[in-house]
């Protein structure tokens, strides 16, 4: 037997093969006895050999012993299990492991049995199965994300939400200056809240939507136009209280820390005078979230998941909570608008060219000091290795430098992409 370069010699008797000599001798004696006595006697006197008779080779083969030998002596000794990809500390890459190989016992039993029956082909190349490289664990990915934040020397608050759209497995990470925080931090939503505005608007848009409404949605998402956002809410929701309808829609979906409390135009009033949420009620962390619009990465990520499930499968929370108000075709339109938001930075910057992403980003300059303090981006990412939701929000009370923030986003996005596409990194 050959297992790759390893040669194993084995006695047939040790693996359950033996000749059935008794049966063959009996068959030969029966062939002799079948000849007429006097004919055989005179042939013997004149030294004449009797005619030959074919006696079939008979054997006994215990395939259970063959299997046992292969499993306990060969596979146990020579099989090599696969080793997973390993994270490269502080980088966005993974080091390839070894796929390993194992004995295909069922196929090898057949091959060995055939060789035992053959008088000529007495050697066997055992059948092997090449393993597959396994993906690192979610915990290893979480550690890599923390290391990337450290390498980028970002000392403010970072919260990341990622969900596998195939399995539903998710990852939540809240981090600040080497310290792990409890996820669910309130961040200024900025323009990411326009995802919620879009979902709410479609509750009240009758199909087919008018060209005017379609244009407003496109400009709100693809161009992040605040004027169009206010116009959409006035046109479809309510001329004054449209933002409150957005908040009610989010609460109906169970997203209790995501809200919009005013229009986007400068000087717009707070409609509720301030909204208290589970996230902004925390006293262990404060990102100074905008009182007009807030969210947490988990909730904006879950909202994107709802849109995806609605568009992809015609199911999910949107259709369950708002039956008859939102349709699968409308969800597909939402994703189309999100994919038109092409900016080449933040999460998008970490993706290879040609990768499809539907996302909404948001940031603002503080009018008091003229600095940027918070950035958010949340999107649906479609890749060969799997589709996922990724939401990343960051805050720094001192200042966020755009170039540094974009590099951090690109690195965090890239490591998640590589995690799903290990063979192409």
Tell where the protein language model's regions lie, with residue ranges.
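Structured C-terminal helix/loop/strand segments within mature extracytoplasmic catalytic/sensor domains
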Residues: 292-295, 302-425
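Active-site SXXK
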Residues: 185-208, 220, 390
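Surface-exposed patches in mature extracellular/periplasmic domains of secreted proteins
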Residues: 80-85, 121-127, 157-162, 207-217, ...
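Surface-exposed, secretory/extracytoplasmic low-complexity segments enriched in Ser/Thr/Asn/Gly/Pro
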Residues: 1-179
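Flexible glycine/proline-enriched surface loops and loop-helix/loop-strand junctions
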Residues: 50-52, 178-184, 213-214, 225-233, ...
